[in-house]
Design a protein with these regions (language model features):
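Extracellular loop-to-transmembrane helix junctions
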Residues: 1-81, 85-89, 186, 190-196
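Membrane-helix boundary/coupling elements in multi-pass transport proteins
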Residues: 32, 55-69, 171-177, 232-271
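Helix-loop junctions at the membrane interface of multi-pass solute transporters
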Residues: 37, 42, 157-182, 186, ...
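Membrane-interface loop-to-helix entry segments
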Residues: 72, 85-136, 147-148, 187-192
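Membrane-interface helix termini and inter-helical loops of multi-pass transporters
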Residues: 72-80, 134-146, 211-219
């Protein structure tokens, strides 16, 4: 648990902040749609620009589908469903958020903001309740007994980097943001809020709910509310966990689609991927 908390502090400073700042500054200097593709093409030529843009778009779509699966996994903890029903609900989720994205970036933004507020309130509750019921030393041990230092750091960094990824995606929307100068300020504030939303609830969970060896197996963030408030609070947090997956999926559709659109306009992808609606320009 100790190493987890250390990495949750270090990785935002050494990984998330540099990526977030360079993406926000470049978006401010060259506010275009599919920014990473355009910037790479400007710096290294069409081949590497296409490669970078295509890889980023594919990664966004593939990881986006994972969030739908995760949402159904959370729902499956409470409701028993057949494989056919699971497939139907997954398809319905995809269709729903595709419709939201077809409405426009403003609608995506409004929904994402609502989701974000709900998520932050839930994690703030975990942090507050956990630290109010402090029972365990969060730094004992720093590294589990019998585990190698290198393997512990390697695994922790790999997971931590994944947790703090995604900041580059804002640059895919640079061409549609009225005032790109706000991105830099928003990015700095966003990274701080995200880091705290990881660090404080994790600290609250470790110090209030044990043993730490059961975290990720039989104990999670919802367990903090379940044990110290009641079953209803734990169930409510699991609903928020589903909402969190919806929020990420909703945003990933918006960002990934912009890259394919610009690639299509440059004749590097099928042209139909660059088609926009005449009314909403989506």
């Amino acid at each position: 648990p100790g190493l987890t908390l250390i990495l949750l502090v270090l990785i935002p400073l050494m990984w998330a902040m540099p990526i977030g700042l360079y993406c926000s500054e470049l978006t401010n200097l060259a506010p275009v749609e599919s920014g990473p593709y355009v910037w790479a093409k400007m710096a290294f030529g069409e081949f590497w620009g296409f490669s970078f843009g295509f890889w980023m778009s594919m990664a966004a779509y593939l990881t986006g589908s994972a969030y739908v699966v995760l949402a159904m996994d959370y729902i499956g903890l409470f409701v028993s469903m057949s494989p056919a029903m699971i497939f139907i609900i997954k398809a319905a989720i995809i269709i729903l958020f595709t419709i939201v994205n077809l409405r426009g970036l403003q609608e995506v933004s409004i929904l994402s903001t609502i989701f974000s507020v709900i998520i932050l309130i839930a994690f703030a509750a975990v942090a507050f309740v956990g630290m109010a019921n402090w029972q365990y030393n969060p730094m004992d041990p720093v590294i589990p007994q019998g585990e190698g230092v290198m393997s512990s750091w390697g695994t922790g960094i790999a997971v931590g980097v994944w947790m703090y990824c995604g900041y580059v995606t804002i640059s895919f929307l640079g061409g549609e943001i009225e005032n790109p100068k706000v991105i830099s300020k928003g990015m700095k504030l966003g990274i701080v809020i995200i880091a705290l939303s990881y660090i404080l609830p994790t600290l609250g969970g470790i110090v209030s709910t044990g043993p730490w060896t059961e975290w990720g197996i039989t104990i999670d963030y919802s367990s903090v509310l379940y044990q110290h408030i009641g079953p209803w609070a734990g169930a409510a947090f699991m609903i928020v966990a589903v909402i969190a997956q919806f929020a990420i999926f909703n945003a990933s559709i918006a960002t990934a689609s912009r890259s394919f659109m610009v690639l299509g306009q440059d004749n590097l992808c099928p042209k139909f991927l660059s088609k926009v609606s005449p009314k909403r320009k989506v």
